[in-house]
């Protein structure tokens, strides 16, 4: 008797599993609230050099700015430069300082802002950019905060993956909640930029526990038949978190209070641990038979299955322990031991890198649109659910490979088309970004389904772990790619679209899994590859 047989006895899908899905909804909603938090927390409002002695009379302020600030090519005042010598404004006297005496002949001399900046506070009362002046020459420091956060997620995923196998999913979920709460509070209370970057990076490592632990806690209590459906349902909670972030961001305009609001839900999460079941499969692999039996009986009772303690005899449970321990624990090296597994792994790594790079590149940069940041975030969240529904129908009709390649190609084309559209046509830019968001979200959803079906059962979790690591690498580099606009304004879009195009072509190299029986062993993968070559 294997564990699947035990699960069949106590119920592989019922009220017990549904309660578990609801309990796991909180960490799934917390993730996008933190992952996408820089959209609000690190936003850069309109700004210009601080000009001491500005007139109190509002009617004179534009003239004062005209005298002190150069204009950009689009007619707006410069955000990063000021005149070395104030320029004389015809027919207006703004004070004794407004004079060009001492300035050399020729073009007016400009210098960087030396006394700080003044910010437009109409949309945000404070962000990390306004608090620590992360603008102009320091704008790279603003982007680095997101990169460090995702590097923390990457490192944390490796650590939590090891620790959860050693100490259990439930215990490490509690650690993730507590550490995310403590580090989130410390981030909100940061007294300087360095403290913020360090605590934010550690927060990313703590939150990585949710990405690693939640899925096994769900899947290891579900029968095979309902795992895909439950997986799709659980992704809806991510979209819910995106929408919730838009609402919370609109209501809270200070980055410290916003970060606090995104962190405090960890408190009910800590309380919910009381009802979260440990993975009975993991308990059996550790030889903790009595604890596993307690959870299995609880599952049977809640699911209405007439299973007594005699049905889960000590002998039957010990047999499962023997079988589970006999299974060889896979490593990342196993993903490259055969030619077909190497092919699948390398292609999936590129696809996941491209999916994450384009998704976060698009999601974290909402500038230049015809909507404010709150409307944009709300629209981004609203478009995710239709994207998931679209994927459901496309993978059934076109298959996984063509759907994945098509969605990535669609994202690449929207980036490419935006290069041809004038930046002044805000409505067209907004429409293209929303369409690109839909394609990138659909590519994300398809990637989870496609990858899980490509790997054999014995390597499925390991394969997903490797590809997810590459995805997080793409997510960490996406904010830095936005800095390429210093070389050429449109270069970030070229980078995002180019990587998406390469990932789309790579997806076409993967085998189709539509209506195919899921491989159980490495031999199944190699056998299927041989059969396809013969055909």
Swiss-Prot record:
GO terms under biological process: alpha-ketoglutarate transport; monoatomic ion transport; organic anion transport; prostaglandin transport; response to stilbenoid
Alphabetical keyword list: Cell membrane, Ion transport, Membrane, Transmembrane, Transmembrane helix, Transport
Swiss-Prot/TrEMBL induction comment: Strongly inhibited by androgen, and weakly stimulated by estrogen and progesterone, which results in gender differences (female > male) that appears in puberty, for expression in kidney.
Location(s) in or outside the cell: Basolateral cell membrane; Apical cell membrane; Cell membrane
Secretion signal span: none
Transmembrane feature ranges: 21-41, 144-164, 178-198, 202-222, 232-252, 257-277, 344-364, 375-395, 402-422, 429-449, 464-484, 489-509
Pfam families given in the database record: Sugar_tr
Gene Ontology CC, one term: plasma membrane
Topological category with respect to the lipid bilayer: Multi-pass membrane protein
Gene3D superfamilies, sorted: MFS general substrate transporter like domains
UniProt GO MF annotations: alpha-ketoglutarate transmembrane transporter activity; organic anion transmembrane transporter activity; prostaglandin transmembrane transporter activity; sodium-independent organic anion transmembrane transporter activity; transmembrane transporter activity
Keyword Repressor: no
Tissue and organ expression note: Expressed in liver and kidney. Expressed at low levels in adipose tissue. Expressed in fetal liver. In kidney, expressed at the brush border of the proximal tubule S3 segment (S3) in the outer stripe and medullary rays. In kidney, expression is higher in female than male.
Biological role: Functions as a Na(+)-independent bidirectional multispecific transporter. Contributes to the renal and hepatic elimination of endogenous organic compounds from the systemic circulation into the urine and bile, respectively. Capable of transporting a wide range of purine and pyrimidine nucleobases, nucleosides, and nucleotides with cGMP, 2'deoxyguanosine and GMP being the preferred substrates.
Family from the record: Belongs to the major facilitator (TC 2.A.1) superfamily. Organic cation transporter (TC 2.A.1.19) family.
Name of the protein described by the UniProt record: Solute carrier family 22 member 7
Lineage of origin: Eukaryota, Metazoa, Chordata, Craniata, Vertebrata
